[in-house]
Amino acid sequence: LRGELERVWDAGTSTDPDGWTSENPARGHCTVAVLLVQDEFGGRILRGLVGGLSHFWNRLPDGSDVDLTRDQFVVWHVTDVEERSREYVLGTAREDGLTTRDRYATIIRRLADLRDVERRPIR
């Protein structure tokens, strides 16, 4: 999943379009990533502060944590961890008003297109 996401993430799907780079493709994608992980594997969504910035990751039903976007941070020190609902995450928006729901829908479409292209026979 992470490899596929790196192929469909861009500045437009990041919560930080000005800070996003191809060298750090996970930047600003934690909200859409946690929704996709929850779609695939279930579990809970956790939120904490990393360097004063809000960050989300997943806790799977077996108790293990999955964070597809942790590497966007140089220093990893999490505080104020709490569980958040899927509805809460979907209701968030970036500064220009583009909602996580809209960014999530874009990523879902791109993943479907990517997977469809990869399944097509070579002619």
Language model features by range: what are they?
Residues 1-123:
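A structural boundary/capping signal
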